[in-house]
Amino acid sequence: MENIDTWADKDLSILIVGFDGYKDVWDIDIYLLNKYWSNRPKTYLATSVLKPEYKNVEVIAIGEGSEWSKKAYNALKVINTKYVLLLLEDFFISSPVNNTLVLDSLHLINEYKIKFYQVLVQLIKSSWEKGTPFQGNKHIKIIPKDKKYPLNLQAAIWDREFLMETIGKGNYNAWQFEIKQISISDINVNKIEYLIDDRNILNIEHTIVQSKYLRAPLKRILKREPSIDIAGRDVLNFKEDFKYQFKLLMYSLTPQCLVKPFKKIGRWLSIDFVTDRVTNNKVC
């Protein structure tokens, strides 16, 4: 592991965009961040109104009524590094981060002027796997044009200015941001600028869906950190967890031409799809 005294000259910051109703999640997330990645870039937490104090984290309260986009955009105006590692508060770092892997990735991003470098893959199998290895590295793929959600809110290192342009000055939620990216068709056409790394270099566990803890990730984290207080939030029951895993499996393995038929099956099983809620303006 590379030992560095400071990240000040590495041109990278970390931005966690938080939802004020997840204060209990912030406490766990930042505890794990400080434990498993203590030597890291300057870290910011963007909130609406709450401004708790955390070690090694600068909290930026954007204002009441701020949705994901407004919090992210205004926090990015405060940050002055060229690149930003964008995270959500339910991305828990579950074991020590190897700074050598992070720095190697940052060097690659700098050298090839990459705008979007995704570092977390949750799908079992997806169109990204068809991407050509970048510079011969089988773990780093060129994002193909037909990838679902080519730009998304999985953990990723973004060019800060490009991220601000992509978000814009509106005030909307995270799901609406991702839905907007479905129609993007010029990914890596004239120049390679969008990559995906399947190594999970930050050792992230995505822990919460539908405001509840996922069973398997929570079990793994509690095995390592039994003292964590999860009393402020429910855990998905077996049926809810099954529905989520079924949906994830469907998106991972289903060809685009079969998504609509499989969604019909999912709705018959009372499975909720974010695209339906966004289309019906039910997400707030």
Model-flagged regions — what are they?
Residues 1-64, 76-78, 82-83:
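N-terminal anchoring/stem segment of glycosyltransferases
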Residues 64-76, 83, 96-97, 101-105:
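A broadly used, surface-exposed interaction patch
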Residues 82-92:
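Short beta-strand-to-loop acidic/aromatic patch adjacent to the donor-nucleotide binding site
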Residues 96-126:
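Conserved donor-nucleotide/metal-binding helix-loop-beta segment in metal-dependent transferases, i.e.
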Residues 132-148:
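Short, flexible, basic/aromatic active-site loop/helix in glycosyltransferases
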Residues 150-216:
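Catalytic core and acceptor-binding pocket of nucleotide-sugar-dependent glycosyltransferases
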